[in-house]
Amino acid sequence: MQTGCEVLMQTASNVIQDKAAAAAGLKAAVRILDKWRATGEQGESILRVSHSSYARARRGDLAEIKLDSDQLARISYLLNIHAALRMLFENPDNVYGFVSMANHNPYFNGRTPLEVIGTGGDFAALYETFKRIDSLRGAQW
């Protein structure tokens, strides 16, 4: 049986690991957004982070950044959109350019996926965009 001190140390270790994973996810998400040529405002809206947090993430200064569950979910969807695009396309221009291409499917109605997810910070738009891009890959997972 663990002592109270051992439980606290284990909990602290889990928190540190979770913070490190969250920071790594944020850093990856910001890099992807940069490759998608998202503006800072779009990136901040998509991830629902402040201007200063986004700027720190771009610099790799992640020590003081705290993320809530909504922000972590947004990072997860963005990383999964990127993973789906990497499965669909071998050409890096398509992997990173797809989100900036006008899409005439009913949900997008001529808008780019980046316009849809980068306007207003709507979580549902991020989810719906992920769902539609993910469906393109069929059973490739």
Predicted regions: what they are:
Residues 1-141:
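Non-transmembrane "mature" sequence context
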